[in-house]
């Protein structure tokens, strides 16, 4: 991180990074004269230098300065740290062989992957580096070209997102950090859709959240069918760990659910939605008519005032039934309007009493 900052800073200041130093850990309240006093004493063996700039590093809560060496210096003479006021100041510098070492590791990695440096540049959208020119380019220049290529490489259309799943084991006595199957399944069903990776990688990430019997099941279904999809894996989990409730039971439970005394219509609809989704998952209710079934059940199972009944009846007659959120919006608006009307009704008698007393005093 510090070395990368040194390289970027040198690039901005247009100075040779091989002839520059960065000193970090300088107390933020130090003036330039105080910094110079310490550096002149501790770096005098390096010869003449020039202080090019100072920045504040938030992560260290301290300053850093960039120095340009004005004389040829033996790298071995550069200290890695100096004793400054307020503590030790670190000295960051780039050794001449760091680019070479990096490129050696890069070549070794590419060789293992069956790739070449020129092929890597082509993949980054840089066509100017051919196989014939690579051996003729110095390590320093090649590292510089690679840095430029990486900076200008096209970014992926989708950011790499990896929302980690919670843990599920399927054990009879789950550990405290584990989720119930229903909660885990709901989260897994949503999150796997966001993972912009291959099916194989999705299955690997899915397996990372599993323990015990659940992980055993994952291994079994993959052994039986190596090309099984993530959705099919989740379906297998439903069959093994899901509720044993039948289609008919799920359907009847939904249709026999009514608004309870004192329960708001919006709260009833929210409670009903959980049962509807379960019935749809069991294929007890076709997904394509879920909105219609929801609206009909609310009209049949809830105690509605005349205004809300008329609005829902209008929605049913006019066209496609509303979605869950659209229906909730209509119901919440009506509940707020009804609550506002009730508050006004409570305040009106008090206002009439006040006017009566005022008129009575006026008569006196």
Curated annotation (Swiss-Prot):
Disordered: region residues: 335-364
InterPro entries assigned to the protein according to its UniProt record, in alphabetical order: PNMA (IPR026523), PNMA_C (IPR048270), PNMA_N (IPR048271)
Domain of life: Eukaryota
Family: Belongs to the PNMA family.
Bias (Acidic residues): 335-351
Protein name: Paraneoplastic antigen Ma2
Gene Ontology BP annotations: positive regulation of apoptotic process
Ranges in a coiled coil: none
Pfam families linked to this entry: PNMA (PF14893), PNMA_N (PF20846)
Bias (Basic and acidic residues): 352-364
Location of N-acetylalanine modifications: 2
UniProt key word Nucleus: yes
Protein species of origin: Homo sapiens (Human)
Location in or out of the cell: Nucleus, Nucleolus
Tissue expression summary: Brain-specific. In some cancer patients, specifically expressed by testicular tumor cells.
GO CC, one annotated term: nucleolus
Additional remarks: Antibodies against PNMA2 are present in sera from patients suffering of paraneoplastic neurological disorders.
Keywords, in A-Z order: Acetylation, Nucleus, Tumor antigen
Major subcellular location class: nucleus
């Amino acid at each position: 991180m510090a070395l990368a900052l040194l390289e970027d800073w040198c690039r901005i200041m247009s100075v040779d990074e091989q002839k520059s130093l960065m000193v970090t850990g300088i107390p933020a309240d130090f003036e330039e004269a105080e910094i110079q006093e310490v550096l002149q004493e501790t770096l005098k063996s390096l010869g003449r230098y020039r202080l090019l700039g100072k920045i504040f590093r938030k992560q260290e809560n301290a300053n850093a300065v960039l120095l340009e060496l004005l004389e040829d210096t033996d790298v071995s003479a550069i200290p890695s740290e100096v004793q400054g006021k307020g503590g030790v100041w670190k000295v960051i510098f780039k050794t001449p062989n760091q680019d070479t070492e990096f490129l050696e590791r890069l070549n070794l990695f590419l060789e293992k992957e069956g790739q070449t440096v020129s092929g890597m540049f082509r993949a980054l959208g840089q066509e100017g580096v051919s196989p014939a020119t690579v051996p003729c380019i110095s390590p320093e220049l090649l590292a510089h070209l690679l840095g430029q290529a990486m900076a200008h490489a096209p970014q992926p259309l989708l950011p790499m997102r990896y929302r980690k799943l919670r843990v599920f084991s399927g054990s009879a006595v789950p550990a405290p950090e584990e989720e119930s199957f229903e909660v885990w399944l709901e989260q897994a069903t949503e999150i796997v859709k966001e993972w912009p990776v291959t099916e194989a990688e999705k299955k690997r990430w899915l397996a990372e959240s599993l323990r015990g019997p659940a992980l055993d099941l994952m291994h079994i279904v993959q052994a039986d069918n190596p090309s099984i999809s993530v959705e099919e894996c989740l379906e297998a989990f439903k069959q093994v760990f899901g509720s044993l409730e039948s289609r008919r039971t799920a359907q009847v439970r939904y249709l026999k659910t009514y608004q309870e005394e004192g329960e708001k219509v919006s709260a009833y609809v929210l409670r009903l939605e959980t049962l509807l989704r379960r019935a749809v998952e069991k294929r007890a209710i076709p997904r394509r008519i879920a909105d219609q079934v929801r609206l009909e059940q609310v009209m049949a199972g809830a105690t509605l005032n005349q205004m809300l009944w008329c609005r829902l009846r209008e929605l049913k007659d006019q066209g496609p039934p509303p979605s869950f959120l659209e229906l909730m919006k209509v119901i919440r608006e009506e509940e707020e309007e009804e609550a506002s009307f009730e508050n006004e009704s409570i305040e009106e008698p008090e206002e009439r009493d006040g006017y009566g007393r005022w008129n009575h005093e006026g008569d006196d």
